[in-house]
Amino acid sequence: FGPGDTAIFPRILNVARSGRFPLVHAGRAVIDITHVDNVVAATRAALQADAPGDGRAYNISNGQPLAVAELLARTFALCGLAVRLRPVPRQLAVTAAGVSELLARLRPGCPEPRLTRYGVGVIGWSQTLDIGRARNELGYVPVTSLEDGLATFARHWKTHDH
């Protein structure tokens, strides 16, 4: 995530503009997102590391797991949106997303559905990453905190996408 994000946060904010947002699994899922500055820092660390080029994969994130409910509340507040979070069971959200995707495919021009199964998966199930190996082998250190990243994203969103 970060300024210019076109993937997750803009879609979430588009739904949130209605004043309501479906809080899948009551927002209890814990996720660990990655600011674009940290992706760049990890790439630089990998290029400069003495680690052998053996094709290893490394987990990269901000290293700050947070419950979805808290992440959304912070994001909406920073973006100046008053949003009521409405708890929705996961299975109901998955089913509704499938219907939303089907209806979008049937519409002329196939507009993007407001709710997708991928989006439900992102906020409905815990997804955290252990960045220990990247820290130890590459010297990776996140350079942008979650708080700073959210603030930067919100400022950009308010001036460019809102």
What kind of region is each of these model predictions?
Residues 46-113, 151-152:
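Mid/C-terminal beta-alpha module of Rossmann-like enzyme folds, strongest
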Residues 5-11, 25-47, 55-56:
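Substrate-positioning beta->alpha
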Residues 36, 96-141:
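Conserved C-terminal active-site "lid" loop/helix of NAD(P)H-dependent oxidoreductases
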Residues 31-37, 63-66, 129, 144:
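Residue-level signal for the nucleotide or nucleotide-sugar donor/cofactor binding architecture
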Residues 2, 24-29, 56-65, 76-79, ...:
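Glycine-rich Rossmann NAD(P)(H)-binding loop
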Residues 39, 43, 60, 71, ...:
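Non-catalytic, hydrophobic alpha-helical segments
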